[in-house]
Amino acid sequence: MSGIDKEELSDKEQEISRLKDVARKSYDKNTVRSAIDKLTMYGKDGIKPITDIIEAPVVDESMKEYGLNAIKRIRIFTPFNP
């Protein structure tokens, strides 16, 4: 059995992965902000990718703060399901 390839990923997973990859490599604040905003719409599935983005060395400090605030919003507005 081989590893997971792109065809096996759902459209949602592919979009999340694409947004994360684009934002982690971007020096443009608008690109990073847009990716974080879109990932926020995925609720708790967006938390890990946003964390990966704000840990990237090329991401500006203001965008790191923006990402942390986005994670806080997700945690506040996403119902807890044990």
Where are these regions (language model features)?
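Amphipathic alpha-helical scaffolding segments comprising HEAT/armadillo-like alpha-solenoid repeats
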Residues: 7-23, 44-55, 76-82
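Generic structural signal for hydrophobic core residues of well-folded globular domains
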Residues: 39, 54-57
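Short inter-helical turns and helix N-cap capping residues of alpha-solenoid HEAT/ARM repeat scaffolds
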Residues: 27-28, 58-60
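Structural detector for internal amphipathic alpha-helices that build alpha-solenoid repeat scaffolds
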Residues: 1-11, 30-44, 62-79
